């Protein structure tokens, strides 16, 4: 790199943290989902902000007092916000709507009460509770509210019929017809739900979730399949899965951390193979995940008719793939495979200039294949930054550098209880008495 890797990573972290400073409503702590005008807040983004403040304090990006004020504002808002079946509430049964109005904090867009986004929020609250441990009134209140918010979530209600957890609920139609079954980002959701002291999920729910797992072989690796890369990353923001194995992973002889490493290496191998012949793919230019894109559009390019998508769950190796690369998702694999991620970061920054002119580091995606007038090395680039892209960049870099979030959450008894009830053993649980 032109400057040391350590300095480059800290610059990326600082740039990503700026998102949570400038795209947050200081009156309620709500974080804008993306940088589009009049866009609502993302509950998952709030969870990442709560996780980001301890990192920012440790890195000198924000004063402790300023961070405490922001965290307290956020937790107070969510604790006191309207909970009920009304269609304009903020949440219900301790869960929260996927998107909230930035000013009022009420439900936006008739969206669903989201279990996964609520899980990310609650994980962020628990991080805050573990970090702010001083004997001041403010930090005591942070700990109290983090605990109270976590205990209020009624996971049994969201399980509904005794099988896997529902993806959500709406006042108009009740529970969504979709369940968290099969490997994805819901690994964290189940650990958090199983650890609840008030409304814990039954252990059978985790068995139901893992029963739909797909074990596959791709580019020389056996691994637990999930197409979009983010599914292999987000739970690892909060949980250090190194050495931890549930029943499924014990049979396979690996852990979820190693599985995510393999998924990262498969992403790179897929880009090198480039089976569909897209522009730009190579060993240091990869990263397919759920993201926005240049479509919807059909274009004839060099005699080939290609379809381009807007937001879609792009994935490897089965697709969909339209040549759209998400730089943030490559960065978020840093703890798993630094030997391929660091050169990729260097390429994105110094070879094709992906950060140039951006206020918050990398924008969400780019597509060198899609025809555009820029004539740059990266071709089309998304106009937007997203909270749930900026968060993993900041937080997974920190886990690589200091393991701060992992160390904080290792101390949380609810997380330990959730891991044990999911059947995990090994790793840090060896030193834990049930």
Task: State each model region's role.
Residues 1-434:
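Ser/Thr/Asn(+Pro)-rich, low-complexity disordered segments
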């Amino acid at each position: 790199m032109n400057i040391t890797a350590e300095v480059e990573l800290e610059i990326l972290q600082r740039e990503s943290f700026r998102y949570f400073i400038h795209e947050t409503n200081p009156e309620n702590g709500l974080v804008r989902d993306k940088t589009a005008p009049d866009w609502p807040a993302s509950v998952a983004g709030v969870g990442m902000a709560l996780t980001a403040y301890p990192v920012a304090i440790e890195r000198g990006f924000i004063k402790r007092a300023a961070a405490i004020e922001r965290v307290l504002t956020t937790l107070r808002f969510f604790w006191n916000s309207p909970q009920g079946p009304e269609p304009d509430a903020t949440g219900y049964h301790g869960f929260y709507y996927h998107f909230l109005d930035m000013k009022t904090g009420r439900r936006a867009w008739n969206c669903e009460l989201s279990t996964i986004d609520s899980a990310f929020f609650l994980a962020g609250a628990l991080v805050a509770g573990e970090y702010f441990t001083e004997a001041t009134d403010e930090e005591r209140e942070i700990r109290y509210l983090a605990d109270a918010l976590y205990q209020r979530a009624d996971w049994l209600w969201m399980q509904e019929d005794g099988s896997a957890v529902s993806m959500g609920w709406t006042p108009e139609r009740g529970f969504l017809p979709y369940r968290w079954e099969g490997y994805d980002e819901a690994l964290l959701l189940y650990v958090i739900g199983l650890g609840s002291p008030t409304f814990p999920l039954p252990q059978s729910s985790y068995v139901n979730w893992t029963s739909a797992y797909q074990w596959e072989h791709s580019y020389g690796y056996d691994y637990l399949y999930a197409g979009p890369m983010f599914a292999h990353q987000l739970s690892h923001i909060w949980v250090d899965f190194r050495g931890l194995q549930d029943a499924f992973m014990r049979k396979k002889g690996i852990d979820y951390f190693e599985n995510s490493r393999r998924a990262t290496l498969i992403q790179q191998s897929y880009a090198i193979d480039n089976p569909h012949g897209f522009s730009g793919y190579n060993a240091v230019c990869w990263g397919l995940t759920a993201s926005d894109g240049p479509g919807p559009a059909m274009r004839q390019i060099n005699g080939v008719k290609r379809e381009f998508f807007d937001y879609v769950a792009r994935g490897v190796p089965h697709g969909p793939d339209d040549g759209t690369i998400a730089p943030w998702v490559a960065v978020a694999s840093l703890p798993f495979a630094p030997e391929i991620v660091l050169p990729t970061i260097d390429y994105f920054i110094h070879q094709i200039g992906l950060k140039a002119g951006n206020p918050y580091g990398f924008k969400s995606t780019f597509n060198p294949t899609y025809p555009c007038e820029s004539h740059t090395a990266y071709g089309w680039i998304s106009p937007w930054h997203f909270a749930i892209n900026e968060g993993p960049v900041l937080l997974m870099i920190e886990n690589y550098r200091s393991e701060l979030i992992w160390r904080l959450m290792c101390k949380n008894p609810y997380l330990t209880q959730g891991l044990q009830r999911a059947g995990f053993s090994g790793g840090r649980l060896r030193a834990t008495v049930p």
